[in-house]
Design a protein with these regions (language model features):
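Patatin-like phospholipase
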Residues: 1-47, 55-291
Length: 291
């Protein structure tokens, strides 16, 4: 039986996953629904937490693989990803230029992503990072999987940049090049975009420096994606999986990940049932709004 995309045509399809901290759980639910409906990608482009999810998917682009990714997310705590202690805070105050160690992210990658180099993924994967000196994007498609993802998730100020050749790489969310542009540059003619969304139902700023930085990044990413889609060459097809709305919580809060996954599965199932993959449009949930 042909999938919806098979019926549309053979053009190269990219899954595009941007950042969003703990809201990356939303992408896991979206991937689950897409996989359950037999919808797959010819390439994956990821930035920030989307780099982590995209790289895992590229290693096992099956429903069983996405279910394993969901199990990982359901078991995550904030400390697993952002390992902080009084010692790290004091070290930051005295002599370090970063607040959080990369050890949490690195362990997550080493424990769960089965391939060590990007070029060994089952589906081509491209990781978007930012040269912290120039602001230019640096796209990694080969070499160490761990180093690429660690770099793409390195929020400036919270994590140290990663030295790479003549660059110092940081979070792909602040890049001059969005994952949408990268997917097109890599030859994709059809984009399926999996946004994490932003905390549109929040009533007050998050508590803490890292939480505020992540919240600001989710707002920036949402605006970037909308702008890029509005400027996209009309020859490129795109379909945006609607993010959760209303979305409660903080991208620094990992206590709601199971709910985010389950809601995203349900909303993506409904979107597909309503022929979402035949309607290229920017959902209102992606545009700036609040409740």
């Amino acid at each position: 039986m042909l999938s919806v995309l098979d019926q549309i045509g053979p053009a190269k399809t990219a899954f595009v996953l941007a950042g969003g901290g703990s809201f990356g759980a939303v992408q896991v639910g979206m991937l689950h629904s897409l996989a359950a409906h037999g919808i797959s990608a010819d390439m994956v482009v990821g930035s920030s937490v989307g780099a982590l999810n995209g790289a895992f998917y590229a290693g096992d682009p099956t429903l069983a693989g996405v279910e394993r990714l969901g199990d990982i997310w359901r078991g995550l705590t904030r400390h697993d990803v952002f390992p902080m202690s009084w010692r790290t805070v004091l070290s930051f105050l005295w002599h370090r230029d970063f607040l959080i160690s990369h050890d949490g992210i690195r362990k997550l990658i080493d424990d769960h992503i089965p391939y060590r180099n990007l070029q060994d993924a089952k589906v081509p994967v491209h990781i978007v990072t930012t040269d912290i000196i120039s602001g230019d994007s640096v796209v990694l498609s080969e070499g160490s999987t761990s180093e690429a993802i660690v770099a793409s998730t390195a929020i400036p100020g919270a994590f140290a940049p990663i030295p790479y050749k003549n660059y110092y790489l940081a979070d792909g969310a602040i890049s001059s090049n969005t994952p949408i542009q990268v997917a097109v540059q890599k030859g994709a003619k059809r984009l399926i975009i999996l946004p994490t969304g932003h905390a549109c139902a929040t009533q007050a700023p998050p508590v803490g420096a890292v939480a505020n930085a992540l919240h600001a990044l989710t707002l920036l990413i949402a605006r970037q994606l909308v702008i890029e889609l509005e400027r996209l060459d009309p020859g490129i097809e795109y379909f945006v999986v609607p993010p959760l709305c209303p979305l409660v919580g903080s991208p620094y809060d990992f206590s709601r990940t199971a709910d985010h996954i389950d809601r995203a599965i349900a909303t993506t199932d409904a979107w597909l049932a309503q022929h979402g993959l035949q309607q290229g449009m920017i959902p209102g949930e992606m545009r700036p709004h609040s409740h």
